[in-house]
A protein has these predicted regions:
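N-terminal glycine-rich anion-binding loops that anchor highly charged ligand groups
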Residues: 31-37
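Positively charged, solvent-exposed patches that mediate nucleic-acid binding
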Residues: 43, 47-49
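Short, conserved charged micro-motifs
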Residues: 14-16, 50-57
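Solvent-exposed beta-strand sheet faces enriched in polar/charged residues
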Residues: 6, 36, 45, 78-80
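C-terminal structural segments of small proteins and small subunits
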Residues: 53-81
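Short amphipathic alpha-helix segments
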Residues: 12-28
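Non-catalytic surface loops within mature trypsin-like serine protease
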Residues: 9-11, 48, 81
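Short glycine-/aliphatic-rich beta-strand segments at the starts of folded cytosolic domains
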Residues: 1-11, 40-43
Length: 81
């Protein structure tokens, strides 16, 4: 089963890369774009033989302990159907 882990900076953390992209977007004439935040995207495959609750726990732990810096980042897990 495939899980997508999306990691972003917490809203209270300054995102200098997002700010730079936002400035470029404005100077290039893209109307209505008011904010850009940069993040990371991970695809994680867990064996279908692993029980569903265990799969969720594995990916959650992986996201918390390996894929993110919990001080400045947050994450969301999306499971593929």
């Amino acid at each position: 089963m495939k899980a997508t882990v999306i990691v972003t900076l917490k809203p209270t953390v300054l995102d200098p890369q997002g700010i730079t992209i936002q400035r470029s977007v404005q100077s290039m004439g893209f109307p209505g774009v008011t904010d850009v935040r940069q993040g990371k995207y991970f695809e994680v495959n867990v064996s279908d033989n692993t029980p569903a609750e265990q799969r969720k726990g594995i990916v959650d732990r992986l996201a918390r302990e390996v894929l993110t810096n919990p001080v400045i980042e947050q994450y969301k897990v999306v499971w593929e159907q």
